From Swiss-Prot:
The lineage of its organism: Eukaryota, Metazoa, Chordata, Craniata, Vertebrata. The keyword Repeat applies. The gene is ZC3H14. Residues 93-104 have a biased composition (Low complexity). PROSITE patterns: ZF_C3H1. Residues 277-288 have a biased composition (Basic and acidic residues). Keywords: Metal-binding, Nucleus, Repeat, RNA-binding, Zinc, Zinc-finger. It comes from Gallus gallus (Chicken). Homodimer; facilitating circular RNAs (circRNAs) formation. This is Zinc finger CCCH domain-containing protein 14. Disulfide bonds: none annotated.
Amino acid sequence: MEIGTEISRKIRGAIKGKLQELGAYVDEELPDYIMVMVANKKSQEQMTEDLSLFLGNNTVRFTVWLHGVLDKLRSVTTEPSGTKSSEPNIFESNHSSSKSSSCVSDERRREDTLPPLAVSSTRSERTDSRVSTSSQEQRNTASRQSCEDGSASRLMSTVKPLRELSPSEAVIDIKPEPDDLIDEDLNFVQENPLSRKKPIVTVTYGSSRPTAEIYRPPASRSADGSLQVHRLPQQGNLQGNRQLDTQSCRSLETVQLCNPEAFGSLAESYRPTSKLSADKVGSEEEGSRKRRLPIVSSVVKVKKFCNDGEEEEEEDDYGLRTGSISSSVSVPAKPERRPSLPPSKQVNKNLILKAISEAQESVTKTTNYSAVPQKQTVPVAPRTRISPEESHLEVIHLQSRLPALCSQLQVEEPKEQAVEGIQGAEQKELSSRLQVDPVIEDTLQVTQDYYDGESMVHTDTRSFILKKPKLSEEIAAQNQQLGKRATEAMRVLSGRLIQTRDQIAQPEKPASPKFIVTLDGVPSPPGYLSDQEEEDMYITEGLKPIPQNICAGKGLKGLRAQQMQIVTRQLDSSDVEMEQLNVLQKQEKVLERCKYWPACKNGDECVYHHPTQPCKVFPNCKFADKCLFIHPNCKYDAKCTKPDCPYTHASRRNPLPSPKPVPLPTQSVSSSSPLCKFFPACKKMECPFYHPKHCRFNTQCTRPDCTFYHPTIAVPPRHALKWTRTQTSE
């Protein structure tokens, strides 16, 4: 029963490892489900059909592997001599069955005479002996170094349980961990030798107990690569060993080496002591005796059942006498974490690399924005007022462009020394700067630089976009083709960003084409305006050209005293004009009181009028609830039934039913006979005159055009109209 449990546990671990290898999502239920199918002896086709939902394209591969393992297990189980060791050989090595049989037969012979030893991976008790494993091959360091360098092959090895008389002997269990059964088809030594490597756990103990020399028979097992450890029998208690668990003993196997020639000189030394000192763990200098091969193993100790005080004292005395290192522990590395998602659902590495490269390119790449030729953003400084005496000259350089439809003016301010040196030759310099350019769009850039820092507090830096200034007649005399098509025009729209959409021409001046632009009396605007406000200001703004009498003979000094043209804008009245525009915009709303006020959700965006001032003629206001001013709230609010209530109703009132129209009595007279003058009180049954027919609805009739008669008095009840025979006296 215990053998079957161990085999089932290992089969289940192998199935779980294979599922993780295939990339399928593994939980505790799927391996159990597969084990149930194995127990039910499902065929390969049935398993493929049932597991296709979970494994997808890997179903066939998994079922072929599983049935191959089961077939090996059945073939080994049928052999009578290999019953107890067949299953570990399937899961841990790929040796032939004959090799396994030889190892198992020896194990069976030992099991008949010796009790099993319990193996515990979590015990911290002491062991009492030193085990030394060696081989008969050459013992040189070169072979050991070649083993460490050529550690491409992976070892899956266990040491057979040592059958001896003493219960205090140590047992070396180099046993594969459950995670090691995950790799390719349980024989990954040949398929993927470099896939996963773990350092071996090496524990070195010091002891004063005599050691049993371990020998190898010269001719018994030299052909195969397995090392069988033999010990000389020592004294012990056989009855105590019988009580140990036998399940772990069956899982112990012989040491199976992939390359026995290369690893023949390996040795393991274990010196048990009474204590494990954590402070002396760093003594890694004894690496010559430690194997750093990729062997996944665990070294365990047998729990000591006999309390020998003398032995403990001897161990303590030996530790103090020799001063050797008590222990040296090397912990195995943490196994690599495998992804739980299948490869088809995992993130593609190419996409991640592509995203990283695109992000780096976007960071390093600079974006080039195309310049807008019509608009220019200019910072506006606070208001500065400069006296005309301290203002400097600004010289405008004209650059005309063929086909002579537009020209570009650049207003620059020369320094004081340059102004003094240039007299009559300035106009020739201006004409020499005229250039040919077929571009039609032109701008005027006015740059003002002020150098006198004592005469002002702030520097007013503004840029103006003017529309197509034209040349004067004097430049036309120097260059007739340009002078015929150019006119003088300047327009200063604002100290902000403004684009002109039409061409405003000013009267031509017969003087030099030098323009002086000043900002006297122009306050700085409070901020930037929207496009709509700029358009409104453009409509309402006006230019104020101030002509000056110019003496051409005075040169630039005369121009400084008498400015040829000053373009100013009256911003003082701009606030009033904006208020008027706001009033006009408000007047554009429908002059009708909002019927949802004061509960209107649109607020100021509502196109209807919302009252803001109280009505002065209330309660004599004749507009009632349609008044454009505020009336007091009605105390009945929505329950008010008065149709012409002058008060304000916050809630919407229910419309009252319209009164029923009273039908007018028809006065139509028959053409044949006149209307009876006693109608409707006529009681003569044979009256020849016309009696109108009564309406069947009587006074309840609601049709205004009803042609039947509607009495104005109440009709007598039905019982009053009942005829009775008159009583005759006898």
